[in-house]
């Protein structure tokens, strides 16, 4: 993986492709490359490093053509270097291919091809695929390039989103998908292909989302989508991209992450818009209305996700069990799909994914559906694979999230789970005034977020005082333990400081051995029933000279006296506190990363959307 862009039309493809790659940088990558048809030959350039390095290559060795493909790579097979960068060419130099995904049986295929005399130049699984297409194409003079691609894909075990061109058919692009997303942009006598919609925005709003097992042949004039295996031609309707150029640009902010932290004063409200019913103390979630009887009769609920979305799921567990009194199990999708989970028709699986393309989460959905469970999706990207695969779902409407470290998508997911828990709870007899109290607090969130953003100078001061430490510990209790986990993850992701999140009471069972006068310990300390216990934990840290940073919505005299720093959020409902307190943790991680000179929006080794298993 990580980013694909293709173009065919009347324009020079180079500016389109390079601009598309820049739009895909947020996904994370280690190299970039471009290939196009120039004078009926493949011209290509690729380079380890940034898209700007590739741009310099293009400036030094200009290439031009109306049909081309480009790629940003995040290494899975083979180290990040010029040779392993995409696009990959076959040994004739007539076929170029870019690929997201993993070819699981590439070693077996490679041995077959070596026996046929194929010489490999890279260490990647992708080169195996382009060489296989080449052998099948040139061994049979009667076969078309499209059918050679089809034939090659019959051999492949694994996941792929591929886009390929051939000098023998110079006005054609072939693309196919199995487990890795591809979006087809439909313009006026031109087409675009991309791994997500962001490179297409500004060129056309009309798109078609390819499904697994589909292949598309593009010329300047038309497109034909068919099934890879049966060759059945498919008629698919156009969808409209629901994002604007402004949403995917930084504007006045130095980094996307900071922009998206500030976006939360509006994005959380957008998530709730039209969904809160204060009079009845409930929520309106049209996307799941038809399956409410199944939800109400569920014997168990699984929440499955990865990374930040998993932390949102842990918060959702507390909320659903509190309001609906239904047992909830939260599982990493990568673990859930490989174990013998108890699933029957009375089971509900909720899959959470910002992109809607997370490979392990999608696989967990498919497994649960096969076993008879009702599946629900909580996604940000409209038309994504998980949104289409699940039986029903709720969009977060947080707007595009470009920074690799999730911010506004996380708070949107928690907001959705809060509304879902309340909706189920009210149907099952939760008192109306209890729902009204929660909704009143949700209605104040935009003001609360603004208050937090206004306190960012003090957060900068805390970051400055702690920037040279090597380790952080984040502690919370109950519903705020997942907040501690998320705070630690944010810090690790973008500042490269080692951090761990722990239940506060578990500190005594190991982590307390690490605490000294160089260890900042962040306490999530709301004024709820756990507050006296949190104070006791803080005293244990102070006794060992730890640096205490407390996040609270009501600092009392004792908390202030025990804490080196107190970061305050506005007083709010205990089930809204995880939303507001997480924003302070996002700002703290951001300021520490800035002071340490880290790459904020594209942290090392990370990808925004993990579309491989």
Where are these regions (language model features)?
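Acidic/histidine-rich
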Residues: 156-190, 467-493, 528, 535
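Conserved short alpha-helical segments that host acidic/polar catalytic motifs at enzyme active sites
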Residues: 1-250, 254, 269-300, 338, ...
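Glycine-rich oxoanion-binding loops at beta->alpha junctions
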Residues: 66, 70-83, 279-293, 316-352, ...
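Glycine-rich, anion-gripping cofactor-binding loops and their flanking helix/strand elements
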Residues: 183-208, 334-368, 506-542, 572-586, ...
């Amino acid at each position: 993986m990580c980013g694909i862009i293709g173009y065919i039309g009347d324009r020079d493809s180079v500016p389109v492709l390079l601009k598309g790659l820049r739009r895909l940088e947020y996904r994370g990558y280690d190299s970039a490359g471009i290939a196009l048809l120039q004078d009926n030959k493949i011209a290509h350039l690729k380079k380890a490093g940034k898209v700007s390095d590739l741009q310099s290559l293009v400036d030094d060795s200009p290439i031009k053509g109306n049909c081309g493909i480009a790629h940003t790579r995040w290494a899975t097979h083979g180290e990040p270097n010029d040779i392993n960068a995409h696009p990959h060419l076959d040994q004739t130099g007539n076929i170029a291919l870019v690929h997201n995904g993993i070819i699981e049986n590439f070693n077996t295929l490679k041995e077959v091809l070596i026996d046929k005399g194929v010489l490999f130049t890279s260490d990647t699984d992708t080169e195996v695929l382009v060489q296989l297409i080449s052998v099948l194409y040139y061994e049979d003079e009667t076969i078309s390039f499209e059918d050679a691609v089809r034939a090659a894909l019959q051999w492949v075990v694994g996941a792929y989103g591929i886009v390929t061109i051939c000098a023998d058919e110079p006005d054609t692009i072939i693309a196919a998908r199995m487990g890795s997303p591809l979006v087809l942009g439909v313009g006026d006598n031109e087409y675009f292909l991309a791994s997500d919609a962001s490179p297409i925005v500004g060129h056309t709003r009309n798109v078609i989302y390819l499904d697994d097992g589909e292949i598309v042949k593009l010329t300047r004039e038309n497109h034909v989508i068919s099934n890879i295996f049966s060759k059945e031609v498919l008629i698919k309707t156009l969808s409209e991209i629901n994002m604007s150029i402004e949403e995917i640009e930084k504007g006045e902010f130095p980094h996307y992450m900071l922009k998206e932290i500030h976006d939360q004063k509006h994005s959380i409200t957008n998530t709730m818009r039209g969904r809160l019913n204060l009079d009845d103390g409930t929520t309106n979630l049209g996307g799941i209305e038809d399956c409410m009887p199944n939800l109400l009769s569920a014997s168990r609920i699984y929440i499955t996700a990865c990374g930040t979305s998993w932390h949102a799921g842990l918060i959702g567990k507390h909320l659903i069990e509190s309001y609906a009194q239904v047992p909830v199990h939260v599982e990493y999708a990568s673990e859930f799909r490989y174990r013998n989970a108890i699933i029957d028709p009375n089971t509900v699986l909720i899959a959470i994914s910002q992109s809607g393309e997370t490979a392990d989460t999608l696989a967990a959905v498919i497994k649960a559906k096969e076993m008879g469970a009702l599946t629900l999706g909580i996604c940000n990207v409209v038309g994504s694979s998980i949104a289409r695969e699940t039986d029903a779902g709720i969009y977060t409407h947080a707007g595009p999230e470009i920074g690799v470290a999730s911010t506004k998508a996380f708070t949107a997911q928690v907001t959705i789970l809060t509304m879902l828990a309340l909706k189920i709870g009210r149907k099952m007899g939760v008192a109306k005034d209890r729902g009204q109290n929660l909704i009143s607090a949700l209605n104040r969130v935009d003001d609360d977020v603004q208050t937090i953003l206004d306190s960012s100078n003090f957060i900068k001061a805390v970051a400055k005082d702690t920037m040279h430490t090597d380790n952080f510990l984040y502690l919370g209790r109950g519903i705020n333990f997942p907040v501690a986990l998320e705070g630690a993850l944010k810090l690790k992701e973008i500042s490269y400081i080692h951090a761990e999140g722990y239940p506060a009471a578990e500190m005594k069972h190991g982590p307390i051995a690490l605490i000294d006068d160089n260890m900042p310990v962040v306490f999530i300390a709301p004024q709820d029933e756990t507050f006296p216990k949190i104070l006791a934990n803080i005293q244990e840290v102070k006794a060992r000279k730890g640096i205490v940073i407390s996040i609270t919505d009501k600092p009392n005299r004792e908390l202030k006296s025990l804490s080196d720093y107190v970061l305050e959020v506005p007083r709010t409902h205990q089930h809204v506190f995880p939303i507001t307190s997480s924003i302070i943790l996002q700002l703290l991680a951001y300021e520490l990363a800035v002071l340490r000179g880290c790459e904020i929006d594209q942290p090392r080794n990370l990808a925004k959307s993990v579309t491989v298993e």
